[in-house]
A protein has these predicted regions:
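Extracytoplasmic small-molecule ligand-binding "clamshell" domains
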Residues: 1-34, 169
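Extracytoplasmic
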Residues: 6, 18, 25-26, 42, ...
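Bilobed "Venus flytrap"/periplasmic-binding protein-like clamshell domains
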Residues: 1-3, 35-36, 53-104, 118-122, ...
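Acidic, Gly/Pro-rich loop/turn segments at junctions of secondary structure
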Residues: 35-43
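Short helix-initiation/N-cap motifs at beta->coil->alpha
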Residues: 10-22, 78-79, 94-108, 142
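Extended ligand-binding regions for polar small-molecule ligands
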Residues: 1-5, 70-71, 76-81, 145-183
C-alpha cells in the first residue's frame, strides 16, 4: 500500500487499547492493525475502504463442553469488536489485554469460551489436538480498513486509491491468499 500510494512508511508498534487515542493525538498517521470498521470507531476516526473483507468472529471453547454463549462467561480482548458484542449480548464479559490471555482463560476455567476473529482462532483450533472446538460464529464489523484521523482527507484519498488499484489488479487477493490461506475471504 505504501508503494502504491508513493509514501515512505515507517512502522510503529502500539498497544491495542491505546491505538486510537495515539492516532488522534498525532503519534502516527494511520492504523493498519486488523481494525474492523465499526460505526462506534467511525465516530472518533475515519477509515479507508476495507482492505480485508469481513470474516466471522468465532466462539471457541473446550471440546465437548455444553456452552450457551448467550449466558456463558465469554473472554475477549479489550477494545475489540468482539468485546463490544459480548458486552451487549447478555453474556458475562471478561476482558484481557491480549488474545493469548483470552485463550488461557478458557484453558484454566476462568471463561467458558472466547470470542475472537475466526481467522485467528482457526489455526489454534486446528493445532489444539482436539482440546478446543468452534462452538459458534457471528458476523460483526464491516471488514478491515486503515484508521485515519478525520482531518487527513488527502492521506485517506491516497490510501483508498492504492487499495482500489490492488483490488482491481488482483494483487490484494493474492496477498490475502498468501498470508491467510486459500480459504480466506477475498474481494
Amino acid at each position: 500500500l505504501c508503494i502504491r500510494a508513493n509514501l515512505d512508511c515507517v512502522w510503529v508498534i502500539n498497544e491495542w487499547d491505546s491505538i486510537i487515542p495515539n492516532l488522534v493525538s498525532g503519534n502516527y498517521d494511520t492504523i493498519i492493525a486488523g481494525m474492523s470498521i465499526t460505526a462506534e470507531r467511525d465516530e472518533v476516526i475515519d477509515f479507508t475502504q476495507d482492505y480485508f473483507p469481513p470474516s466471522p468472529s468465532v466462539y471457541m471453547g473446550m471440546s465437548g463442553a455444553d456452552i450457551d454463549v448467550d449466558s456463558a462467561v465469554i473472554a475477549a480482548q479489550t477494545a475489540t469488536i468482539q468485546a463490544g458484542y459480548v458486552a451487549e449480548s447478555g453474556a458475562t464479559l471478561v476482558e484481557f489485554a491480549t488474545a493469548e490471555e483470552t485463550i488461557s482463560a478458557v484453558q484454566n476455567g476462568e471463561a467458558d469460551a472466547v470470542l475472537a476473529d475466526g481467522d485467528y482462532l482457526a489455526s489454534i483450533i486446528a493445532e489444539s489436538n482436539g482440546e478446543f472446538a468452534n462452538i459458534g460464529e457471528v458476523s460483526i464489523g464491516g471488514g478491515v480498513g486503515m484508521g485515519i484521523r478525520e482531518s487527513d482527507t488527502e492521506l485517506k484519498a491516497k490510501m483508498n486509491a492504492a487499495i482500489s488499484s490492488m483490488k482491481d489488479d488482483g494483487s490484494l487477493n493474492a496477498l490475502i491468499k498468501k498470508w491467510f490461506g486459500f480459504e480466506a475471504a477475498t474481494f
